[in-house]
Swiss-Prot record:
Protein name: SWI/SNF-related matrix-associated actin-dependent regulator of chromatin subfamily A member 4
Gene: Smarca4
Gene3D superfamilies: 1.20.5.170, 3.40.5.120, Bromodomain-like, P-loop containing nucleotide triphosphate hydrolases, Tandem AAA-ATPase domain
Phylogenetic classification of the source organism: Eukaryota, Metazoa, Chordata, Craniata, Vertebrata
Domain HSA: 460-532
Binding locations of ATP: 779-786
Length: 1613
């Protein structure tokens, strides 16, 4: 059989392994020495014999089958247990067991327990190289004790043998006894670790050395003791064949190798062939012991055991005595198995070396020679394997490579094994030292005794352990019991305390709960009465509670209301006094004239051309008392003719409702003035009488009934009974003392009927007029404030004979809408729309002066601009639309209206809820009623800090806050009327708002991610001449850029241009599908708009940015949608036409594109029923205004508001902030938060929180599908089904298109320059920052001479003679010629050097071309012109208004780009007064017109950036007019001064004056001549005084410095 492959890449063995197991030498290659598996193989030859700690004898003669041996052991054990050891059968079986048990290969290897019981060391703790063996109690633990029949008998003179013969007959013959004794002695010597003498070895084997054998011994090597050493030759090594095994060494059990299988019956592992008979035995070179044992060892014939799996070579002839079945014939049936009679040898025997020992070979030399040969073969083999040809087959090459690597690992394996052996030896020595008796015993015990002893010892240990554990357990139990008793005692004590504590706490909790319930009940009752305005009950509860703070608040409220009531009374009394004086004057004028024609209410005579002439005049028949009114009554213009034709009629006296009192009442009141004031209730009751026109007498019962009804109608503050019980009038009743019922609208209002709540609003407005008060109509947007205002005007014209003029101030965007409403509702009212160019406005002046108009509509701007025209008219009523623009008391509009315009009656219209700033609210009330609301600080103190004076904490609880708000409401209620849609207009269709989340396209996502993380926008690199390579662009105001990206990425022009080139479009504009594929919002619109058009729903689309509207127009053109557009650039005259076109019933335009700011105010677009807010505004009221363009009176359909919001973007934060603002505004006022101050740190933190991307819930981030969107926009089921079919058709059509693309752009469609990772973007950003930091290159600076060319004496002389310019020019020429001379001298002296320097100059010029090109040279302006400019600019800057505030303060210097980046994005040409002054100094302006352009540009920039009506906006308008007037004034002064100066100069030339005076005159003459020369076009050199010396400062820009130098250079030419 072939040898198995060597493990671990070792070289193949030349022959089979001779031992019972694979040789470990196979892993290291063949070795001539001892087996590497042994403990001594790595350490060289051992100085002594191998340790006999674990003897493993070789094959003996008695080889029995394993099964027979197991069957024999059972009766032996049973006989031993029955006490039958003397039975001859027992001794016979025991002898057979001893002979067979000497062979370890008779069965499977013993278990660890068997090893322990038989003296073998345990594999876990035993050592292979113990110095003393473990005593064995069985026959298998000793060396082989059986011998063949040819064994030599022991010496007859042995006393032990004699003793045994004397004891009686023995079953052994003499030779057997000698052999047995020799074996016992050898066993004892081996047990003590002593060497065996040669004669003892021969006696143990039962043989005598014969002469023939002794001669052959040197030639035959001794048999191998271990199966681990392979033969050195190519032949098969010695196996377990015939030949004696030396008893001085046996391989320990289990040392065959880590992977060696257990030995078979013959000691050979499975698969390993045994040695054929007759093979040469292998010598064992083991030091001197091997030399000693070699001549005495003789081959022993052994019978191999029966093979278990396969046949083995035939053994030699076996004597009958060695048969495995039959006992030896020479033996008696009983065999000596008891070793008891043998006395062990206690004395150490000396080592005996026989004399006849032959001279053998030196094993060390043989070992060295073998090692040399092996090393040479290994080296040769490695060379062969390294030089193998490359044409070998793959499997052969693999085997050769494995063999080469194995040979190279040989030394490493040797070192590793040596280290392992060293470690094992060290450990073994330590264990042996600690337990010296582990491997020896002095007394041999039988197996039974050992077992009994072991059993008793085990029982004793178990008992001791049990007692110890029991004692310890009792100790622990006592401790635990004590701890348990201790805890139990304290637990009972603690439980009693807890019960007591719980009982006390329960008592107090119940008491507190009951008290809390009672307090809550009282507080709820108090709040209920407070909300129900039951002040008497509320005060009683406050008295019961004895809450000082609430009582103090109520006391303060009473004081404030009492003060305001007194102020209202004073105001009304003052107005009545004014009316009396006015009427007295009229009466006197009438008496003086004697007979007066019919006059109007304003004292002017009526004629046929006036508007009043068309109104009917009420007349009464003197005798019958019949009154003619309405159509039966004569017209005012035809009154005199009608009275002549109808005698007996006269003009009926005016009632109290139309006139504050008759002349008789006035006289009575005048007489009553010196008398003490009557109780407040009586005059009010008299005033409240409204007599019926048909009957002058009214009963007292009716009068009282009317009074009570009027009180119940208007007094919503307190009940009538409570007011009468206190004997006081309520604040509201005092304010609206005079009441008048209004049941229907004026006859002048046509084409519509007012709704009931609008009639109530008209009644409230008329009540304000009757009580000489002004107020705020603050109905919610869409409830018809414009219509109610027109109703008031027509009512006053018809019933009060107030013909006007009425001044209505409106925003420019709503002026056309007002005109449209007037034309529709009151066409008979003469109105003037005062707007347009200056020439157009001047055309209205004659009509305004004649007074032939009723209403003048104008804007805030023209009120300020044309106040010199409009303020001359005495207005009867001033009405301001969008009145919240007046919230700033210091704004220009408020100041102009208060100071220049005369209008006793004022009305504010606003649909926006009142803001949370008290000064703004006070500003509105102060504008309306300056005599009542005088001081802002007092007003703010009333409501802002009620406890500031008491020293208590200012924080207010909910109840106190409600009291403060009610206090404010109580103050506002007489002057403010506000109704909500849900309260007054039940039939108005509902408005449903949906927020639709839109996904981003891949382009949007990439741009958004980098803008959010780094604040940079990706570009294609074209701005840096790196087109296609990519780049970045840092932009300010990151939030604005993120909003642009969310709307549409093409709002960045370079992105669209790069993409158009990438997609193949020309002109830099993207068209077609890619317009909506680039934006998620546009893609949603592309799905929604076709459905809305198919179902005839008109759409209002509101955007924040006009550039986005332009992109949307391209999309509408691509889809073929008809649309209209209105933004801030739309002219006022065009707006009305756009509204009319869109609102027409059959209009083809179904989309109206509006900007939120320009188109969200005052427009009436109720023909649309769908509002799409493309992007939300920071101010939520702007979006509400936009929604109410459609959701207003007249709307017949349900209104759907769709607010688009990009998912996971900054728009979600803006929407959340807007909702928060709306929630705050619902309270109207929050106590303690009126100032609304926030630090810059808080604002930055808020913006940072918006920029941070937070993870949202998946449900919130879910983009709705088509079905969800259809549910949002569908009004009923039929529309929903239609929309679903349209979606299905669209998807089918897209599927049929072979070139179809996804609805939104994906990343694989993007160009390479936009797909950058974060590291690349960081690199590009750093490059851009470095370029900004270091610049693009150096710039050549010119040399500047700051020294004076003339001395002071020379300069004075030149001034006197007038030759200053000539002298300076000469000096300049001298310097230049001197410089040229130096250059020419240097050039002539070194021509080569000059050539080099010229080359260098040329190179430097080429290098400097990267800088800014030289500026255009400017010649200085005339001094007179510069002086004029400075004078005008200084006058404009120093202008102050009436309050002493300098208007130009914010215009002097603009904020930097970092502070206000939005300004520089919106304003293309920023300019301020500082820059204007610099340009004047640098002679940039050639005339006053150039200066005027920049000043007007400055004002226009302010008006563009700021909201209309803001303070800066108004100041810019004033500064424009100031500049114009100052310029005209200076030009006039200049003309007059020119004439006077000519006269003065003539007189000065004739007279003789001082020298200094003559010098000044000459200077003036020189300036005059120069100015005239310039006007004629001639050129003169400027004088010294007019020459602008270049000055370099840090503030000047490089460009201006170069212009200065170039300007000075032009003087040299």
């Amino acid at each position: 059989m072939s040898t198995p492959d060597p493990p671990l890449g070792g070289t193949p063995r030349p022959g089979p392994s001779p031992g019972p197991g694979p040789s470990p030498g196979a892993m290291l290659g063949p070795s001539p020495g001892p087996s590497p598996g042994s403990a001594h193989s790595m350490m060289g030859p051992s100085p002594g014999p191998p340790s006999a700690g674990h003897p493993m004898p070789t094959q003996g003669p008695g080889g029995y089958p394993q099964d027979n041996m197991h069957q024999m052991h059972k009766p032996m054990e049973s006989m031993h247990e029955k006490g039958m050891p003397d039975d001859p059968r027992y001794n016979q079986m025991k002898g057979m067991g001893m002979r067979s048990g000497a062979h370890t290969g008779m069965g499977p290897p013993p278990s660890p327990m068997d090893q322990h019981s038989q003296g073998y060391p345990s594999p876990l703790g035993g050592s292979e190289h113990a110095s003393s063996p473990v005593p064995a109690s069985g026959p298998s633990s000793g060396p082989q004790m059986s011998s063949g029949p040819g064994g030599a008998p022991l010496d007859g003179s042995d006393p032990q043998a004699l003793g045994q013969q004397n004891r009686g007959p023995t079953p052994f013959n003499q030779n057997q006894l000698h052999q047995l004794r020799a074996q016992i002695m050898a066993y004892k010597m081996l047990a003590r670790g002593q060497p065996l003498p040669d004669h003892l070895q021969m006696a143990v084997q039962g043989k005598r050395p014969m002469p023939g054998m002794q001669q052959q011994m040197p030639t035959l090597p001794p048999p191998s003791v271990s199966a681990t050493g392979p033969g050195p030759g190519p032949g098969p090594g010695p196996g377990p064949g015939p030949g004696p095994a030396p008893p001085n060494y046996s391989r320990p059990h289990g040392m065959g190798g880590p992977n060696m299988p257990p030995p078979g019956p013959s000691g050979v592992p499975p698969g390993m062939p045994g040695q054929p008979p007759g093979g040469p035995p292998k010598p064992w070179p083991e030091g001197p012991m091997a030399n000693a044992a070699a001549p005495t060892s003789t081959p022993q014939k052994l019978i191999p055991p029966q093979p278990t799996g396969r046949p083995s070579p035939a053994p030699p002839a076996v004597p009958p005595a060695a048969s495995p079945v039959m006992p030896p014939q020479t033996q008696s049936p009983g065999q000596p198995a008891q070793p008891a009679p043998l006395v062990p040898l206690h004395q150490k025997q000396s080592r005996i070396t026989p004399i006849q020992k032959p001279r053998g070979l030196d094993p060390v030399e043989i070992l060295q020679e073998r090692e040399y040969r092996l090393q040479a073969r290994i080296v040769h083999r490695i060379q062969e394997l390294e030089n193998l040809p490359g044409s070998l087959a793959g499997d052969l090459r693999t085997k050769a490579t494995i063999e080469l690597k194995a040979l190279r690992l040989l030394n490493f394996q040797r070192q590793l094994r040596q280290e392992v052996v060293v470690c094992m030896r060290r450990d073994t020595a330590l264990e042996t030292a600690l337990n010296a008796k582990a491997y020896k015993r002095s007394k041999r015990q039988s197996l039974r005794e050992a077992r009994i002893t072991e059993k008793l010892e085990k029982q004793q240990k178990i008992e001791q352990e049990r007692k110890r554990r029991q004692k310890h357990q009792e100790y622990l139990n006592s401790i635990l019991q004590h701890a348990k008793d201790f805890r139990e005692y304290h637990r009972s004590v603690t439980g009693k305390l807890q019960k007591l504590t719980k009982a006390v706490a329960t008592y107090h909790a119940n008491t507190e709960r009951e008290q809390k319930k009672e307090n809550e009940r009282i507080e709820k009752e108090r709040m209920r009465r407070l909300m129900a305005e039951d002040e008497e009950g509320y005060r009683k509860l406050i008295d019961q509670k004895k809450d000082k703070r609430l009582a103090y608040l109520l006391q303060q409220t009473d004081e404030y209301v009492a003060n305001l009531t007194e102020l209202v009374r004073q105001h009304k009394a003052a107005q009545v006094a004014k009316e009396k004086k006015k009427k007295k004057k009229k009466k006197k004028a009438e008496n003086a004239e004697g007979q007066t024609p019919a006059i109007g209410p304003d004292g002017e005579p009526l004629d046929e051309t006036s508007q009043m002439s068309d109104l009917p005049v009420k007349v009464i028949h003197v005798e019958s008392g019949k009154i003619l009114t309405g159509t039966d009554a004569p017209k005012a213009g035809q009154l005199e003719a009608w009275l002549e034709m109808n005698p007996g009629y006269e003009v009926a006296p005016r009632s109290d409702s139309e006139e504050s009192g008759s002349e008789e009442e006035e006289e009575e009141e005048e007489e009553e003035q010196p008398q003490p004031a009557q109780p407040p209730t009586l005059p009010v009751e008299e005033k409240k009488k409204i007599p019926d026109p048909d009957s002058d007498d009214v009963s007292e019962v009716d009068a009282r009934h009317i009074i009570e009804n009027a009180k119940q109608d208007v007094d919503d503050e307190y009940g009538v009974s409570q007011a009468l019980a206190r004997g006081l009038q309520s604040y509201y009743a005092v304010a609206h003392a005079v009441t008048e019922r209004v049941d229907k609208q004026s006859a002048l209002m046509v084409n519509g009927v007012l709704k009931q709540y609008q009639i109530k609003g008209l009644e409230w407005l008329v009540s304000l007029y009757n009580n000489n008060l002004n107020g705020i109509l603050a109905d919610e947007m869409g409830l018809g404030k414009t219509i109610q205002t027109i109703a008031l005007i027509t009512y006053l014209m018809e019933h009060k004979r107030i013909n006007g003029p009425f001044l209505i101030i409106v925003p420019l965007s709503t002026l056309s809408n007002w005109a449209y409403e007037f034309d529709k509702w009151a066409p008979s009212v003469v109105k003037v729309s005062y707007k347009g160019s200056p020439a157009a406005r001047r055309a209205f002046v004659p009509q305004l002066r004649s007074g032939k108009f009723n209403v003048l509509l104008t804007t805030y701007e023209y009120i300020i601009k044309d106040k010199h025209i409009l303020a001359k008219i005495r207005w009867k009523y001033m009405i301001v639309d969008e009145g919240h623009r007046m919230k700033n008391h210091h704004c220009k509009l408020t100041q102009v209206l208060n100071t220049h315009y005369v209008a006793p009656r004022r009305l504010l219209l606003t649909g926006t809820p009142l803001q949370n700033k008290l000064p703004e609210l006070w500003a509105l009330l102060n504008f309306l009623l300056p005599t009542i609301f005088k001081s802002c600080s007092t007003f703010e103190q009333w409501f802002n800090a009620p406890f500031a004076m008491t020293g208590e904490k200012v924080d207010l609880n909910e109840e106190e806050t409600i009291l403060i708000i009610r206090r404010l409401h109580k103050v506002l209620r007489p002057f403010l009327l506000r109704r909500l849609k849900k309260e007054v207009e039940a039939q108005l269709p509902e408005k449903v708002e949906y927020v639709i989340k839109c996904d981003m396209s891949a382009l949007q996502r990439v741009l958004y991610r980098h803008m959010q993380a780094k604040g940079v926008l990706l570009t294609d690199g074209s701005e840096k001449d790196k087109k296609g390579k990519g780049g970045t662009k840092t932009l300010m105001n990151t939030i604005m850029q993120l909003r642009k990206i969310c709307n549409h990425p093409y709002m960045f022009q370079h992105i669209e241009e790069s993409f158009s080139e990438h997609l193949g479009f020309t002109g830099g504009i993207v068209q077609g599908l890619d317009l909506y594929r680039a934006s998620g919002k546009f893609e949603l619109l592309d799905r929604i708009l076709p459905k809305l058009r198919a179902t005839n729903h008109k759409v209002l689309l509101f955007c924040q940015m006009t550039s986005l509207m332009t992109i949307m127009e391209d999309y509408f053109a691509y889809r073929g949608f008809k649309y209209l557009r209105l933004d801030g650039t739309t002219k006022a005259e065009d707006r009305g036409m756009l509204l009319k076109t869109f609102n027409e019933p059959g209009s083809e335009y179904f989309i109206f594109l509006l900007s939120t700011r320009a188109g969200g105010l005052g427009l009436n677009l109720q023909s649309a029923d769908t509002v799409i807010i493309f992007d939300s505004d920071w101010n939520p009221h702007q979006d509400l205004q936009a929604q109410d363009r459609a959701h207003r009176i007249g709307q017949q359909n349900e209104v759907r508001v769709l607010r688009l919001c990009t998912v996971n973007s900054v728009e979600e934060k803006i929407l959340a902030a807007a909702k928060y603002k709306l929630n705050v505004d619902q309270k109207v006022i929050q106590a303690g938060m009126f100032d609304q101050k926030s630090s810059s740190h808080e604002r930055r933190a808020f913006l940072q929180a918006i920029l941070e991307h937070e993870e949202q819930d998946e449900e919130e981030d879910e983009v709705p599908d088509d079905e969800t969107v259809n549910q949002m926009i569908a009004r009923h089921e039929e529309e929903f089904d239609l929309f679903m079919r349209m979606d299905l058709d669209r998807r089918r059509e897209e599927a049929r298109n072979p070139k179809r693309k996804p609805r939104l752009m994906e990343e694989d469609e993007l160009p390479s320059w936009i797909i950058k990772d974060d590291a690349e973007v960081e690199r590009l950003t750093c490059e851009e920052e470095e370029e900004k930091m270091f610049g693009r290159g150096s710039r050549h600076r010119k040399e500047v001479d700051y020294s004076d060319s003339l001395t002071e004496k020379q300069w004075l002389k030149a001034i006197e003679e007038g030759t200053l310019e000539e002298i300076e020019e000469e000096v300049r020429q001298k310097k230049s010629s001197r410089k040229r001379k130096r250059d020419s001298e240097a050039g002539s002296s070194t021509p080569t050097t000059s050539t080099r320097s010229r080359d260098k100059d040329e190179e430097s010029k080429k290098q400097k071309k990267r800088g800014r090109p030289p500026a255009e040279k400017l010649s200085p302006n005339p001094p007179n012109l510069t002086k004029k400019m400075k004078k005008i600019v200084d006058a404009v800057i120093k202008y102050k208004d009436s309050s002493g505030r300098q208007l130009s303060e914010v215009f002097i210097q603009l904020p930097s780009r970092k502070e206000l980046p939005e300004y520089y994005e919106l304003i293309r040409k920023p300019v301020d007064f500082k820059k204007i002054k610099e340009r004047i100094r640098n002679h940039k302006y050639r005339s006053l017109n150039d200066l005027e352009k920049d000043v007007m540009l400055l004002c226009q920039n302010a008006q563009t950036f700021n909201l209309e009506g803001s303070l800066i906006y108004e100041d810019s308008i004033v500064l424009q007019s100031v500049f114009t007037s100052v310029r005209q004034k200076i030009e006039k002064e200049d003309d007059s001064e020119g004439e006077e100066s000519e006269e003065e100069e003539e007189g000065e030339e004739e007279g003789s004056e001082s020298e200094s005076r003559s010098v000044k005159v000459k200077i003036k003459l020189g300036r005059k001549e120069k100015a005239q020369d310039r006007l004629k076009g001639g050129r003169r050199r400027p004088s010294r005084g007019s020459r602008a010396k270049p000055v370099v400062s840090d503030d000047d820009s490089d460009e201006e410095q170069e212009e200065d130098r170039s300007g000075s250079g032009s003087e040299e030419d």
